[in-house]
């Protein structure tokens, strides 16, 4: 049976650090989106003469759309931060059913390829760094195909997941 990187056991404090990394990534994303929004607004306001602005309504409309999209991106990132503010994943015994907050390792039944992921309410696809050099973890949400497949399962269960049109069989080899 495979274990998480470096045979580590993820503790409550470690998961708190993983959540902290997620928060920092979302905060960085929000700041970048707000900066991009401000740059678009500045360019729309100062980048053309009044005559050019009147003649090119299409460019003004595009700038407005980009500004709104960046504002939405920032709002979405801050909503994720709000969600994580109350997210307190605890340590799970190896026999626990998988739920949000679990650290899960799965292994491909055909080739033995393993993946370790952190099941979180937000942050799909983000990469987190394990505390103390315990390796990297990808964030999976419960709405993703793999998230849906593993919810409620236990160590040793086998799940089928469709990846790029192919059904793959994965065995759960660690829950923590």
Predicted regions and their residues:
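Helix-rich terminal scaffold detector
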Residues: 2-80
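Sparse recognition of residues in long alpha-helices and their boundaries
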Residues: 42, 49, 86, 171-172
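Long amphipathic N-terminal alpha/beta scaffold segment
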Residues: 65-112
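Non-DNA-binding regulatory cores of transcription-related proteins
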Residues: 92-162
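Short, charged beta-turn/beta-strand-edge "cap" motif at the junction between a beta-strand
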Residues: 110-111, 162-170, 176
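Short, conserved beta-turn/loop elements at beta-strand boundaries and strand-helix junctions
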Residues: 124, 175-176
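C-terminal structured interaction module
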Residues: 153, 157, 170-175
